[in-house]
Amino acid sequence: MGLTVSALFSRIFGKKQMRILMVGLDAAGKTTILYKLKLGEIVTTIPTIGFNVETVEYKNICFTVWDVGGQDKIRPLWRHYFQNTQGLIFVVDSNDRERVQESADELQKMLQEDELRDAVLLVFANKQDMPNAMPVSELTDKLGLQHLRSRTWYVQATCATQGTGLYDGLDWLSHELSKR
């Protein structure tokens, strides 16, 4: 009985807990995004060899965000973070046209993973402040997202250094996850 009352109170008054995995190729801006959300400021980053994990509270939701390094040698380790992931944030450098196919390939590999079958997908089309950045429509096409039939997904234009679009993406993510 006590557990039931406790669960009821946490549903009414408590923060909802969500496990989010944030991945993408190296230098896409994952760590910058994480700490912009957590601290509200830009921090100096170095390539992530392993992971950063932080809790980000936003609109009565407690996001546990796992930022996993994106260098090609450590991408096989991504699968160790898949379990219990409710939301997948895939960060793409919109300005890096030479590597967009590599991003698409990595994303498609992840979406085939059984442990991620129920995770909603939020793509952050990052670095939109750059003059050659691909717009959302072009990036959506190059990532092949329009072919995803059995998954909820959304692409949000972002600029991590300015914070533009980050909270819009979290709004979408929290809305989708709250429906589950």
Swiss-Prot record:
PROSITE patterns: ARF. Gene3D superfamilies: P-loop containing nucleotide triphosphate hydrolases. A lipid is attached at residue 2 (N-myristoyl glycine). Keywords: Cytoplasm, ER-Golgi transport, Golgi apparatus, GTP-binding, Lipoprotein, Membrane, Myristate, Nucleotide-binding, Protein transport, Transport. GO terms for biological process: intracellular protein transport; retrograde vesicle-mediated transport, Golgi to endoplasmic reticulum; vesicle-mediated transport. CDD domains: Arf1_5_like. One of its GO terms (molecular function) is GTPase activity. It is a lipid-anchor. Pfam families: Arf. The keyword GTP-binding applies. GO terms for cellular component: cytoplasm; extracellular exosome; Golgi apparatus; perinuclear region of cytoplasm; plasma membrane. Its main location: Golgi. Belongs to the small GTPase superfamily. Arf family. Interacts (when activated) with GGA1, GGA2 and GGA3; the interaction is required for proper subcellular location of GGA1, GGA2 and GGA3. Binds ASAP2. Interacts with NCS1/FREQ at the Golgi complex. Interacts with RAB11FIP3 and RAB11FIP4. This is ADP-ribosylation factor 5. It comes from Homo sapiens (Human). The gene is ARF5.
